[in-house]
Amino acid sequence: MAAAPPAAVSEPTAARQKLLALLGQVQTYVFQLELLRRCDPQIGLGKLAQLKLNALQVRVLRRHLRPGLEAQAAAFLTPLSVTLELLLEYAWREGERLLGHLDTFATTGDVSAFFTETMGLARPCPYHQQIRLETYGGDVRMELCFLHDVENFLKQLNYCHLTTPPSGATAALERVREFMVAAVGSGLIVPPELSDPSHPCAVCFEELCVTANQGATIARRLADRICNHVTQQAQVRLDANELRRY
């Protein structure tokens, strides 16, 4: 008996699969950038040819995909399209910046200056963005420092969007996008600097569920919780022979 032919994959599913594969490839490139900016620059110089080729491919991808991603953003946003757009923007910026700093190091040989530039030690903190939302009744100002600040700002915009000029909302959302590129553009795991200890995580909830509550509710105990699960150093046991092997 002949086997049934495989079911045809719908066009949206096929497009989603291609975007996921592309997202994984760009994420791998970004991971390489994050490693090279923290490594001995001599290692980066040894991989300069491959790095330039990857940077060129990111340029091509950004040029081809950006119009389509912008068109989709104007019609219907999805988490996948937003993540890919932010990741491509971050990969393009940081890849070009790293190449420039490697070229400078090849000329000067200054290791300290290389790390100062690649780690952004001489630049303002990218995780502090001043947001100004123009409304017909006055201006709303706030500073984005954490990811939940973005959520709070979008809630405010949703509340007062009828009194906000389109141009003012667009300008404010551009600043939000810049913050998101710096915050989550490097990957789905955000930097520890973006963790607010006053906001408990899922691990905090699990711990409070198995400890004595002394009559207090979970909500009350979560409100008094200081979370350090994101910023505390993980305890990892490594064997010296394993390090030599890999």
From Swiss-Prot:
Gene Ontology terms describing biological process: viral DNA genome packaging
Keywords of the record: Late protein, Viral genome packaging, Viral release from host cell
Superkingdom in the source lineage: Viruses
Organism for this UniProt entry: Human herpesvirus 2
Descriptive protein name: Processing and transport protein
Protein family (similarity comment): Belongs to the herpesviridae PRTP family.
Function: This protein may affect translocation of the virus glycoproteins to membranes. It is involved in capsid maturation.
Any single Pfam family the record assigns to this protein: PRTP
